[in-house]
């Protein structure tokens, strides 16, 4: 109990950019549609990573590839990040066999705008993370998942 409290209270992550934007986006997804949190994250995370990747954060995404998937560390940050996203997608959709698109689960874009606005509501209209996301950005990421 003590360890889980420390793991989840956010104190240890102070000053470090987090994936909280993606989690907030998925909570909206599973609140509206019949999809589990884990499956929603599996569909969202690769598209979210592609959307938010830039020259300032590509090295962090590349680290996912080298540390989790054993990808070549000598690749450029951008190339390593792209390969990491591909490896993550392959794991979710080929290895685990999960449906890879929201449309595979009968989900359409009907509620995307409301979901995006709800995801940002408590944070002043913007989700913070690798990059700040507005409701317009979130709708685009949801659409990438169709």
Please provide the spans of the model-predicted regions.
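Active-site segments that bind and position negatively charged phosphate/pyrophosphate groups
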Residues: 1-87
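C-terminal charged capping/lid subdomain of soluble metabolic enzymes
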Residues: 61, 67-146
């Amino acid at each position: 109990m003590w360890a889980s409290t420390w793991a989840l209270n956010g104190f240890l992550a102070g000053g470090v950019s987090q994936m909280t934007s993606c989690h907030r986006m998925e909570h909206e997804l599973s609140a509206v549609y019949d999809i589990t949190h884990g499956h929603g994250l599996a569909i969202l995370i690769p598209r979210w990573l592609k959307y938010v990747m830039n020259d300032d954060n590509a090295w962090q995404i590349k680290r996912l590839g080298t540390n989790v998937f054993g990808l070549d560390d000598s690749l450029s940050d951008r190339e390593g990040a792209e390969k990491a996203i591909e490896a993550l997608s392959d794991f979710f959709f080929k290895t685990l066999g999960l449906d890879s698109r929201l449309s595979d689960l009968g989900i359409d874009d009907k509620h995307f705008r409301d979901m995006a606005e709800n995801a940002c509501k408590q944070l002043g209209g913007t989700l913070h993370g690798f990059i700040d996301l507005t409701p317009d950005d979130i709708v685009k990421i949801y659409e990438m998942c169709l």
